[in-house]
Amino acid sequence: MSLLHTFWRLPVAVFFEPHEENVLRCPERVLRRLLEDAAVAMRGGGWREDVLMDRVRKRYLRQELRDLGHRVQTYCEDLEGRVSEAEALLNQQCELDEGPSPRTLLQPPCRPRSSSPGTGVAGASAVPHGLYSRHDAITGPVAAPSDAVAASAAAGASSTWLAQCAEQPLPGNVPNYFGITQNDPFIRFHTDFRGEVVNTMFENASTWTFSFGIWYYRLKRGLYTQPRWKRVYHLAQMDNFSISQELLLGVVNALENVTVYPTYDCVLSDLEAAACLLVAYGHALWEGRDPPDSVTAVLSELPQLLPRLADDVSREIAAWEGPVAAGNNYYAYRDSPDLRYYMPLSGGRHYHPGTFDRHVLVRLFHKRGVLQHLPGYGTITEELVQERLSGQVRDDVLSLWSRRLLVGKLGRDVPVFVHEQQYLRSGLTCLAGLLLLWKVTNADSVFAPRTGKFTLADLLGSDAVAGGGLPGGRAGGEEKGYGGRHGRVRNFEFLVQYYIGPWYARDPAVTLSQLFPGLALLAVTESVRSGWDPSRREDSAGGGDGGGAVLMQLSKSNPVADYMFAQSSKQYGDLRRLEVHDALLFHYEHGLGRLLSVTLPRHRVSTLGSSLFNVNDIYELLYFLVLGFLPSVAVL
């Protein structure tokens, strides 16, 4: 006889009644499930499907919980390892002998280190972490050379925490000096160029103070009325134009990040995208000689490529047909009115159709065969399918040269610019910035008679500048090949060789705003001065000339200050912070286009610089473009 024997043997439904021979041999959960199934079967309808779906959801939920637990365990183990490494670093006794006071040292690269009596390592004890470069944040700071440490030990000052923890140098021959002007010595630094310059400047200011122009003063006055920012940026003394070191570093940090797009899938900087566009544009120049095979090689060709590009742009503007963007901006993007973020999020990373049709560089590249077709226009379905299958446009010069330059960095994952159009847009904007730099920096010679009073000693002190100049230097000569009086002006060529190239060698992810924060500040100021608003792109009044209301416009809107608040405020979410950053980036693009579209860009830049930033001549302009500020000394 079976263990479960029914009292009534009926074929309709099997219910087990109490019986002396019935023995229950199933777990409680199985019995509960049988009861639920019976109840569902009796109710009918959609109850059975709901129960089955609940079971499926519970099974997937258990699997997800197990995966989550595994990931949390892995993360905790990794965190424990990193904490152990940090404890080991903190426990290490890496004491350095005392050296000279933290100062950015000056020494030309042609001189041996031992020949300079003040050779040492520059440190920035009060520089915020946010101002360090991304390369330093990943690989660690540059180690101090052994002879520099020995010289530091002979002079007698304490080293900074950054210098103590820098035990391994960066791989390769990475320069730690930059040259800005031909008539000044090179600036030698440790890891953070601008942070150490600012720190040295404020350390030397014992009997004097600095003013940085009316733009910085208006920013200080606007923040002074807000108790939180007054405390964060150490604001005081509203009766003078001086600002605190914290506020200056906050502004410079915001300007450096204008073209640094904060997304995980951004694989190219705007400088690398511009190099790809330039090498495809100038492919005819490589006939008869070895073409460039790296971004560094393209950057070295900037003095030859940009003049040719400027001439072609001038001819294209002279033969312009069709409407021009508001304010006669030939470098404008026709974004949709509801565009809030820089990165296109739909349509296969394509912008709104018509975005590039009023940009002079796109028209020029289309005529020269750099771009096979304008992005978003007249795309044939068969061609689009073929492009997606092959990964590049048929006979696409830009894709071929991009792969040549970037295959060593990205392998096979080199983006196609006409499909991932954020790279095309960033490259075009960077090209516009480089064109503006070439036009304004080579407008006059640094050896001409000066009208300004700023000198490099105002930044680093007279002791650091003395004895560290170039051959001849400001005392009455020029370096061979860069003569201002005996040859054509070559300020831009000097920057390319001794500033842009060395910085890219240190950090291949550097962007144009990190190289020239002063250029970003000028462009944003010009955009705000015009009254343009990225949230009202179709407003015709927003593209006007702006009259002379420079100060009135600046007092009403300051996207740089908005981004500073978004960076340091916990009230901003990630999307809101990204929106504020992109608004600043849109202002930067619009301002560059306006400055380049005027007949004399040098005159417009000079007007903005002299009225807002203490810039009076080409020598001061070069330092302002590189540093993002220009101090004017005032005795206490």
From Swiss-Prot:
<dbReference type="InterPro" id="IPR002493">
    <property type="entry name" value="Herpes_UL25"/>
</dbReference>
<protein>
    <recommendedName>
        <fullName>Capsid vertex component 2</fullName>
    </recommendedName>
</protein>
<keyword id="KW-1163">Viral penetration into host nucleus</keyword>
<dbReference type="Pfam" id="PF01499">
    <property type="entry name" value="Herpes_UL25"/>
</dbReference>
<keyword id="KW-1160">Virus entry into host cell</keyword>
<keyword id="KW-0946">Virion</keyword>
<keyword id="KW-0945">Host-virus interaction</keyword>
<dbReference type="GO" id="GO:0019072">
    <property type="term" value="P:viral genome packaging"/>
</dbReference>
<dbReference type="GO" id="GO:0042025">
    <property type="term" value="C:host cell nucleus"/>
</dbReference>
<keyword id="KW-0167">Capsid protein</keyword>
<dbReference type="GO" id="GO:0043657">
    <property type="term" value="C:host cell"/>
</dbReference>
<dbReference type="GO" id="GO:0019028">
    <property type="term" value="C:viral capsid"/>
</dbReference>
<feature type="region of interest" description="Disordered">
    <location>
        <begin position="97"/>
        <end position="125"/>
    </location>
</feature>
<comment type="subunit">
    <text>Heterodimerizes with CVC1. Interacts with major capsid protein/MCP and triplex capsid protein 1/TRX1 at the pentamer vertices. Interacts with the large tegument protein/LTP.</text>
</comment>
<comment type="function">
    <text>Capsid vertex-specific component that plays a role during viral DNA encapsidation, assuring correct genome cleavage and presumably stabilizing capsids that contain full-length viral genomes. Participates in the interaction between the capsid and the tegument through interaction with the large tegument protein/LTP.</text>
</comment>
<keyword id="KW-0231">Viral genome packaging</keyword>
<keyword id="KW-1048">Host nucleus</keyword>
<dbReference type="GO" id="GO:0075732">
    <property type="term" value="P:viral penetration into host nucleus"/>
</dbReference>
<feature type="region of interest" description="Interaction with major capsid protein/MCP">
    <location>
        <begin position="1"/>
        <end position="48"/>
    </location>
</feature>
<dbReference type="GO" id="GO:0046718">
    <property type="term" value="P:symbiont entry into host cell"/>
</dbReference>
<comment type="similarity">
    <text>Belongs to the herpesviridae CVC2 protein family.</text>
</comment>
<dbReference type="GO" id="GO:0019033">
    <property type="term" value="C:viral tegument"/>
</dbReference>
<keyword id="KW-1188">Viral release from host cell</keyword>
